[in-house]
Amino acid sequence: VTTRIGINGFGRIGRNYFRAALAQGADLEIVAVNDLTSPEALAHLLKYDSVGGRLTETVEVKDGNIVVNGNIIKVLAERDPANLPWGELGVDIVIESTGFFTKAAAAQKHIDAGAKKVLISAPASDEDITIVMGVNHELYDPAAHNIISNASCTTNCLGPLAKVINDEFGIERGLMTTVHAYTADQNLQDGPHNDLRRARAAAINMVPTSTGAAKAIGLVLPELKGKLDGYAIRVPVPTGSATDLTVTVGRETTVEEVNAALKKAADSDAFQGILTYTDAPIVSSDIVGDPASSIFDSGLTKVIGNQVKVVSWYDNEWGYSNRLVDLTELVASKLG
């Protein structure tokens, strides 16, 4: 039986999730999307994408719903998740990608409205579990976990990197900088914002700002709790980011040894499609549209004694959305 999916919030991640499910040929039926705008606008933004290009599938609006390749997707415009007809529509799993309902109590409204599970496409609070595919997904327990966070795009990039280095060398402490594409949470032109750096024009500045990614690593790798911190510098690209991690490890090592450990991990079954390895001298454009969570750049590794610096690229929209599809399939495979 195909698992029925509802998407709450059809923005960058909601739409990329839809495209990723199509691209993967996932055994998931997206039956409804909820967003506070017109079906025409949602259909147009699904079909035409400034980063991902034009969708080859036919996309139309009929009777207020979106029709993709003949499949009808019901369009809802409900502000309060409690009022969504998930039960009536037979929705099994809700993708919560509005960015607003990241607290468990708010996400619970989807379950009260008839859904079985909620996957939050962001760091959450009071969630049953935070999962990074390839790092701690085997801890998923369908009996205990109903509200699940897929963490952030940056935690999905950092997680595999930190796991491999910690398993191989032991991380004592470390600091991370992510050089990150701008997002809709920044201003296009200078204007008020509660973060006075994000207040500034996104497309013409390097914007230092917070990221919870390093601290959140303790949620998926408890042995690293309190050992990592960092921040982001948002830069003028629409997608395509890089995580730069510098750690003190438990013993002296070399560039060759660090790269060999990451190559071995990237080639292993455990990290297939999640952690990949490149020795090509790439730039951010080269990884746009890459579905991996973490694209390790071996040419950038630096080592001095027991101090190690590594860099992994990620398409913060597409890679993350593909992991959200993978997580949905994991949860779907264990539905009662």
Model-predicted segments: where are they?
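C-terminal active-site/capping subdomain that shapes the small-molecule cofactor and substrate pocket
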Residues: 230, 242, 246-336
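Alpha-helical scaffold segments in soluble metabolic enzymes
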Residues: 12, 16, 20, 44, ...
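Generic structural signal for well-ordered, non-membrane alpha-helical segments
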Residues: 10, 14, 103, 151-154, ...
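Short, solvent-exposed beta-strand edge segments and adjacent coil->beta transition regions
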Residues: 144-145, 201-203, 240-244, 307-309
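Acidic, glycine-rich segments within the central catalytic cores of soluble metabolic enzymes
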Residues: 167, 171-238
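Short clusters of hydrophobic/aromatic residues that line enzyme substrate/ligand-binding pockets
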Residues: 66, 131-133, 147, 188-189, ...
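Generic secondary-structure signature for well-ordered alpha-helical cores
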Residues: 22-26, 163-171, 181-184, 211, ...
